[in-house]
């Protein structure tokens, strides 16, 4: 399980180092093999361990292909997916096209989302995080089933 928000830096080639606390799990689960694709809702990237991505692909494959919404989602997620592997230093290269989509430059945030990571531009992450917190703190903004989750 991946949790926490981690400040990371992209080098001039677009590589970033996976925080060391995740490397052992990624190595044992998927030999450091990752899939990076766009997030179809937010202006960030999704980074999946290969085993998690294979489950997503199976779900996408099972969708009825006659529905335009399904084909659209498949095109976006699968069409932008890139196979990557952690190198010996625990780094991976984010392709230019995906860096452009998420407006990634030097400072970024790698945010654990249980089964995957989101990779955000640092300023965009700070803005969306503040907006999310403000929205959820509004009276009546949180449904009862979600309120029950909060300890």
UniProtKB/Swiss-Prot annotation:
Biological processes annotated in GO: negative regulation of DNA-templated transcription initiation
Gene3D superfamilies: Transcriptional regulator MraZ domain
MF annotations from Gene Ontology: DNA-binding transcription factor activity; transcription cis-regulatory region binding
Location of the SpoVT-AbrB domain: 5-52, 81-124
GO cellular component, one term: cytoplasm
Subcellular location per the Swiss-Prot or TrEMBL entry: Cytoplasm, Nucleoid
Keywords: Cytoplasm, DNA-binding, Repeat, Transcription, Transcription regulation
Superkingdom per UniProt: Bacteria
Principal cellular location given in the protein's record: cytoplasm
Oligomer status and interactors: Forms oligomers.
Protein family: Belongs to the MraZ family.
The protein's name: Transcriptional regulator MraZ
Organism: Pseudomonas putida (strain W619)
Gene assigned in the entry: mraZ
